[in-house]
Design a protein with these regions (language model features):
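Conserved catalytic cysteine-centered active-site region
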Residues: 20, 51-105, 147-153, 210-236, ...
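Condensing-enzyme catalytic core mediating Claisen C-C bond formation in acyl metabolism
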Residues: 1-20, 135, 214-278, 282-285, ...
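Active-site-proximal alpha-helical scaffold in enzymes
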Residues: 80-112, 161-190, 243-250, 315, ...
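Conserved active-site "lid/cap" helical segment
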Residues: 1-52, 56-57, 61-65, 69, ...
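Active-site pocket-lining segment
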Residues: 155-158, 191-194, 201, 264-333
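Flexible glycine-/small-residue-enriched beta->alpha junction loops
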Residues: 99, 105-159
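N-terminal extracellular/periplasmic Venus flytrap/periplasmic-binding protein-like
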Residues: 7-8, 19-20, 25-28, 36, ...
């Protein structure tokens, strides 16, 4: 079960979190997750943190975050790189370890500083005999470009949008909804209980009050002139971290901890490389089937807004009423620090369910390379 869920605000590229390395953000989230429920660092038995952009991060980023949060050196750790699904996979692994009886209490989540991703010069080690060298942006190379077809995620999104018949107009309307819902949630204080401030930053930097359908519809497609994916209906490039404390039922009872949510089922799937828009729904359907549930049994759904097209297609495949999806906005507005987004959608959904009487919640996310993960929880 999950007894704590905390995240940092999500900062824009070069914004309010630019001076923090991913591991520092991870430490802040871990420390806050423990403090929220009165757990001591020495009680934690293991740490699993997702991080995608590990170039230049140093050895064992999850261990860095763990030690930085004040956990004992005896606490082991794993760093997960499953692209956008990294942090939700971390929670799945924690759940599996606890069910196997290996541990009773694990911190799981993710962290990313896309602002601090370095550039690389591949042939610099042995020098260039002749000609020019090219700097490689490790943010786009390791995080945003498909290894298999060499296309940027935006190019894949536009291609699949055409293949699946997802109109540009629908994508822009969903993007507008994402910003509007996120602003409403911020104004209503809905994110306060899940966010730990970092320095002077206490709210997500991405949501725009001044956006409109007219503005979004005038943006030019990115990469593909005939495409439908724009800077407006895609998420930003962001920094942030999130951490959840996952425990056994016996540990929570013994320590007198109130569970925020129970993990009911998990699922993970793989598909053709470009078809990210299908994998959240496929994973979600599998998780529901494992639990013997139907989508109509679910009160809230969080589908990571890797692009508006991903949410639109996955919601259609799941057969879910869009009004139950991303009710407080999503990554198009809030941001998508790739290694931390799974932790964010899971935590946001938990608190939303608690405000509305509980029930089942489904969190699903796609990831580069054509994979997808889903967690079904109950509050």
């Amino acid at each position: 079960m999950i007894v704590s869920a905390v995240r940092t605000p999500f900062g824009k590229l070069g914004g309010g979190l630019v001076d923090y390395e991913a591991t520092e953000l991870g430490s802040i989230a871990i420390r806050a997750a423990l403090e929220r429920v009165g757990l001591e660092p020495q009680e934690i038995e293991y740490v699993i943190m997702g991080q995608v952009l590990q170039g230049g991060a140093g050895q064992a980023p999850a261990r860095q975050a763990s030690i930085g949060a004040g956990l004992p050196i005896e606490v082991g750790s794993d760093t997960v790189n499953k692209v956008c699904a990294s942090s939700i996979r971390a929670v799945e692994m924690a759940d599996q370890m606890i069910r196997a009886g290996d541990h009773e209490v694990i911190v799981a989540g993710g962290m990313e500083s896309m602002s601090n991703a370095p550039y690389a010069l591949k042939k610099a080690r042995f020098g260039y005999r002749l000609g020019d060298g090219t700097l490689i942006d490790l943010m786009t190379h390791d995080g945003l470009t498909s290894t298999f077809d060499k296309r940027h995620m935006v190019e894949q999104a536009s291609f699949v949008s055409r293949e699946l018949g997802i109109p540009r107009e629908d994508q822009d309307r969903w993007a507008l909804r994402s910003h509007q819902r996120a602003i409403e949630a911020i104004d209503d204080g809905k994110f306060q209980e899940e966010i730990v401030p970092v320095g002077d930053l206490s709210v997500d930097e991405g949501p725009r009050r001044d956006t409109s359908y007219e503005k979004l519809s005038k943006l030019q497609p990115v990469f593909d002139p005939e495409g439908t994916t724009t800077a407006g209906n895609a998420p930003g490039v962001n920094d942030g971290a999130g951490a959840l404390v996952v425990t056994s039922e016996e540990f929570a009872r013994r320590r007198g901890l109130e569970p925020l949510a129970t993990i009911v089922a998990q699922a993970y799937v793989a598909d053709e490389f470009a078809y990210l828009a299908r994998t959240p729904a496929k994973a979600g359907k599998e998780a529901l089937a494992k639990a013997g549930k139907k989508i109509d049994d679910v009160e809230r759904v969080e589908l990571n807004e890797a692009f508006s097209s991903v949410v639109l297609n996955s919601a259609k495949m799941l057969g879910v009423d869009p009004e139950r999806v991303n009710v407080n906005g999503g990554a198009v507005a809030l941001g998508h620090p790739i290694g931390a987004s799974g932790a964010r959608i899971l935590g946001t959904m938990i608190y939303e369910l608690r405000r509305n009487g509980g029930g089942l919640g489904l969190a699903a996310i796609c990831s580069g390379g054509g994979q997808g993960d889903a967690l079904l929880i109950e509050v």
